[in-house]
Structure formats: structure tokens, C-alpha cells
UniProtKB/Swiss-Prot annotation:
Cell wall formation. Keywords: ATP-binding, Cell cycle, Cell division, Cell shape, Cell wall biogenesis/degradation, Cytoplasm, Ligase, Nucleotide-binding, Peptidoglycan synthesis. ATP binds at residues 117-123. Pathway: Cell wall biogenesis; peptidoglycan biosynthesis. Its EC number is 6.3.2.8. It is found in: Cytoplasm. It holds the Pfam family Mur_ligase. This is UDP-N-acetylmuramate--L-alanine ligase. It is an enzyme of class 6 (ligase). One of its GO terms (biological process) is cell wall organization. One of its GO terms (cellular component) is cytoplasm. Belongs to the MurCDEF family.
């Protein structure tokens, strides 16, 4: 096992091993020599990848899947207390470890960069992982999405840097002690866990307080929530700001769209740097600059890291081109919060100009729809036409009166052309029928709407 890794994690069992965060930790543990086992609801490419690393992956949740000699059981906040494997762990006296504690253990003895914020964590973490790898620095990383290249959400590297997403949704990011922390933005999103912006600020203040002595907080200068956090933290932590604001420490001078790419010019430590970002959208350019500033804070020369950022070609579901058929491009977006929806739609508009943008949107979570349904509808008004599916519940039970109709009504009030569809399986044919050559179709949401992109392409090919 790697230095600093508790022996209690030499035979871990993961409940929900196929999840983005869980699978990454499982992969790193397997690469470090642990005897990894776990269970997931269904077969997947992730399950196959884990098996290829020597892990045992069971399909379905059952008490007998948990080996009596497991050293610990790893869970995320999404695992219910009545899960049969969790119940069995209690009966056997096997320690239960939260995903965040396992990740914190993996980072012990290394130089962690923890990437936090309401939006953009996966992209920024990925940009750092790819660019640092491009420079042969051998980083370890744990990402909440799958890279286009090198094709994994996690890796045990031989270098001293560990890049990880830091999730605020359940306050698990309080477990980490980073040398560099990034805060991309601060908004109220996870309404089941936070009642107010004050609670959000307090949570991010706690996170920033975990930065090791001599460490650095890299934080957005253009986002009001981040600026307020900076004001609250004044004098308590070394801070480097980035953005287009004149007072930013790392100032963005320009973001020039170039089709599905951007050219970004910044000033860092008095030197002007111009580099390419291989994904479209101003928000992704800002993510790249955050990565650049974080690398510089760790001592990686910006003049070397900036060109290496061009090696980042995207994360699955983050404006990922799924294909083209009948002259129609189909792109997948993970956006599920109004801010993300707006940013991705604006990025696509900048990329395609006057071409029509059609959106197939699947709301994610009843609680989020209850609080932000109006804003989601307003965001959809940026598209030329939208189809809205029923809410993807994920871990939540229904809330009376909360349906996707809240979004549809708000979209229509904002002047949007929107069609509600309750039969998800019928939506690919409907969207394909709406599209014509030159259009761009965007499947949008954090649920299983991603599976519909290939089906739309199939319909277009008929």
C-alpha cells in the first residue's frame, strides 16, 4: 500500500462503486494494491474498468455481497441507511468510512489541490490533471467525470501532486487539507442541505480554513459570491484572485472564440500569456485560468503550464460532441443548475452563430426544481426550442406539486418555444423530427438524459 494509507483500507468494500466519486477512489486504491470489492445497481463501463484493475464488482445490493473479512465499507451521502450491505456491515462490526474520508486518506503525504465551487469543479480538476500529466509531473487525481483523454476519472500517479474535486453539497470538503484550494464560484444550490447563503458562506469559510499553513486560496474575482467570500476571509489565508476584473491578481485580458475552442490572454506576475483552450465558452476559459493560477501557486511555471492546458479536450457530458447525422450535431451537457445552463447555452451560441439550438432538458432533483424551476425555464429561453422531460429524482422522493411543469410555465413566460414530454423514450424521435440540417441539439441535465444523444443520432440517420 502507498505511504500514509491506513491499513483499514487494504480490503475496502464500496457500496455504489460505480458512482463518479466512488469509482475514482476505488480505482486509486486498486492501483495502490488494495483488494477492492463493491456493488452497484447495474452493469457499466465503469464496473468493467474496475474489474480490469482486479476489483470484484457485484451487481445489485445484497448482504451476501459484503465479505466478512472486509477491512471497511466505503459509502457516499447518497447511500440510504437501510441498504442491506450497510446493515450487514453494522452486524459484522466492520467500520464504515465516508467517501470523503477515504479521499482525504489518499491525499495524505502529498501536495493536494482541492477544487471547489458550485459549478465547474469537474472541468477545472480535469484541466489540471491533463496539463500536469502533459508536463510529466505524474499527478494523482480524482475527478467527478470521465476524461476524453487519458480516459479515466482517477489515477494513482508517481508524482507528489494530488488533484481532487472538493464537494460542498454535503460539506464533505471540510475533510481535506489542501496546499492549494480553488473556489470557482459560490451559489446556493443544494437546498436540502443548505437553508441560506449565510450557511453556504460559513461552509466555504470552513473549507478555506483547512488550507495548510503557507498554502494558497485561488478564487474568482468576477463572481459576487466568491468576492463576498474573499471579503469574509480577508487576512486569514493567502489569496490569489483571477478573472476579468481590473483588480484580479491573474487578470484575463481577452477570451476570443475560435469555433469550438477559445484563445485566452492573461497577465500573471507581470507577464502576458496567450494560450488555447480546446473547449468553447467563456466559463471554460475562466476554469482554465483558475487551473493556471493553482499550478503557479504550487510552483509550476505558468509559461509551461499554459500551453499544456491545450491538451485538455473535454470531459464526458461537459459539452461533449456525441456525433453528427443528417447535418445535425448532437452535444451532451451536464448542466442542471440555471447558471450552468445559461453558460453552456451562451457557449454554444458563440460557437454556432445563427444556427438553431434545440435542447432536450431533463430536470435533476425535486428540491432543485422546487427552488430554481423558474430560473431553469428562463435559461431555456436562450435556446430556439426546447423539450422538457420529467424530473430525474436521483436520491430524492417526490415533493407534492413539484413537477417539470414549473419549468415549462416559466420558459413560456420568458417567451421560449418549449414542449413538455412525459414519455422519455418517445423524445429522441420527437427531437430528431424537429431538427433540420445545420441545427445543434443539446441533451442537457445530470440524469440519464445523456443516454438519449445516441438515440437521437440513430433517429436522424433513418
Amino acid at each position: 500500500m502507498a505511504p500514509g494509507l491506513p491499513t483499514a483500507m487494504d480490503r475496502p468494500h464500496f457500496i455504489g462503486i460505480g458512482g463518479a466519486g466512488m469509482s475514482g477512489i476505488a480505482k486509486i486504491l486498486a492501483q495502490r494494491g488494495a483488494e477492492v470489492a463493491g456493488s452497484d445497481a447495474k452493469e457499466s463501463a465503469t464496473a468493467d474498468a474496475l474489474r480490469a484493475l482486479g476489483a470484484t464488482v457485484h451487481i445489485g445490493h445484497a448482504a451476501e455481497h459484503l465479505a466478512a473479512d472486509a477491512s471497511c465499507v466505503v459509502v457516499s451521502s447518497a447511500i440510504r441507511e437501510d441498504n442491506p450491505e450497510l446493515v450487514r456491515a453494522a452486524e459484522l462490526g466492520i467500520p464504515v468510512v465516508h467517501r470523503s474520508d477515504a479521499l482525504a486518506a489518499l491525499m495524505n503525504g502529498l501536495r493536494p489541490i482541492a477544487v471547489a465551487g458550485t459549478h465547474g469543479k469537474t472541468t477545472t480538476t480535469s484541466m489540471l490533471a491533463v496539463s500536469l500529466s502533459e508536463l510529466d509531473l505524474g499527478p494523482s487525481y480524482a475527478i467527478g467525470g470521465d476524461l476524453d483523454a487519458p480516459g479515466s476519472n482517477a489515477l494513482h500517479g508517481e508524482g507528489e501532486i494530488f488533484v481532487a474535486e472538493a464537494d460542498e453539497s454535503d460539506r464533505s470538503f471540510h475533510k481535506y487539507a489542501p496546499e492549494v484550494a480553488i473556489v470557482l464560484n459560490v451559489e446556493l444550490d443544494h437546498h436540502a442541505n443548505y437553508a441560506s447563503m449565510d450557511e453556504i458562506y460559513e461552509s466555504f469559510e470552513t473549507f478555506a480554513g483547512k488550507i495548510v499553513p503557507g498554502g494558497t486560496l485561488v478564487i474568482a474575482a468576477d463572481h459576487e459570491g466568491a468576492r463576498e467570500l474573499t471579503r469574509r476571509l480577508a487576512g486569514r489565508v493567502r489569496t490569489v484572485t483571477y478573472g476579468e476584473s481590473e483588480d484580479a491578481d491573474v487578470r484575463i485580458l481577452s477570451v476570443v472564440p475560435q469555433g469550438l475552442k477559445s484563445e485566452v490572454t492573461v497577465v500573471l506576475d507581470g507577464a502576458e500569456l496567450t494560450f488555447a483552450v480546446s473547449v468553447p465558452g467563456r466559463h471554460y476559459a475562466h476554469n482554465a485560468v483558475a487551473a493556471l493560477a493553482a499550478g503557479a501557486a504550487l510552483g509550476v511555471p505558468a509559461a509551461e503550464l499554459a500551453p499544456a492546458l491545450a491538451a485538455y479536450t473535454g470531459v464526458k457530458r461537459r459539452l461533449q460532441l456525441k456525433g453528427e447525422a443528417a447535418g445535425v450535431q448532437v452535444v451532451d451537457s451536464y448542466a442542471h443548475h440555471p447558471t450552468e445552463m445559461t453558460a453552456d447555452l451562451e457557449a454554444m451560441r458563440a460557437a454556432v452563430g445563427d444556427a438553431r439550438i434545440l435542447v432536450l432538458f431533463q430536470p435533476h432533483l425535486f428540491s432543485r426544481t422546487q427552488e430554481l424551476g423558474k430560473e431553469m425555464g428562463q435559461a431555456l429561453a436562450l435556446a430556439d426550442a426546447s423539450v422538457v422531460l420529467d424530473i430525474y429524482p436521483a436520491r430524492e422522493d417526490p415533493i407534492p406539486g413539484v413537477t417539470s411543469e414549473l419549468i415549462v410555465e416559466a420558459a413560456r413566460a420568458a417567451g421560449a418555444d418549449v414542449t413538455p414530454v412525459h414519455d422519455k423514450d418517445a423524445s429522441p424521435a420527437l427531437v430528431a423530427g424537429m431538427a433540420k440540417a445545420g441545427d445543434l441539439v443539446l441533451t442537457m441535465g445530470a440524469g440519464d438524459v445523456t443516454d438519449l444523444g445516441p438515440r437521437i443520432l440513430d433517429e436522424l440517420s433513418k
